[in-house]
Amino acid sequence: DGQVLFKVCTLDTEVQITKNMVSISKDVKKLTGRTFTPSVIEPSFGIGRIIYCLYEHSFYTRPSKSGEEQCNVFKFSPVVAPIKCTVFPLVQKKEYETTATSLSRQLTRVGLSCKIDTTGTSIGKRYARTDEIGVPFAVTVDSEETVTVRERDSKEQVRVPVDLVPSVLKDLCDRLLTWEEVKSAYEVVQNAM
């Protein structure tokens, strides 16, 4: 009849619980997180000052797209950047995520350290996160045949066939190609972030 008698041992009394006092609901929550990999470098020969100078020389801020806040950017050269590129599917579609995972493996095979980000956050926020940790290039999977490659400092993007991305990024990171040469060889994406 919607009531239950419940004995509270610590109070040595009985309490009546009615159905009005209890509600059961099912909620779906979307959780997004940010991972942080802490590391400590403590060499004994004074390289800490050199690294500090590298950080100091490479850090700057630029206005966000809305102009209301400042975005932090580490302008590491691709040669010294610990992570060379990030790979994002533009939207959460199975085929884009499959292409992104495959591309990430190909980039690792050619010796480029990369991160893949399949979170559902906006592409602008994902770009800002990678700019903040000094990643020079971002690959956005928005098709199964071609992707956009974004250069961090200019925020310019070019459309590159998926099968050519590993070699193009490897050549950019090894300074065998310049960003200007890549822009002249591939279609520049207008109105890019």
Language-model segments: which ranges?
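NTP/phosphate- and nucleic-acid-binding module
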Residues: 1-193
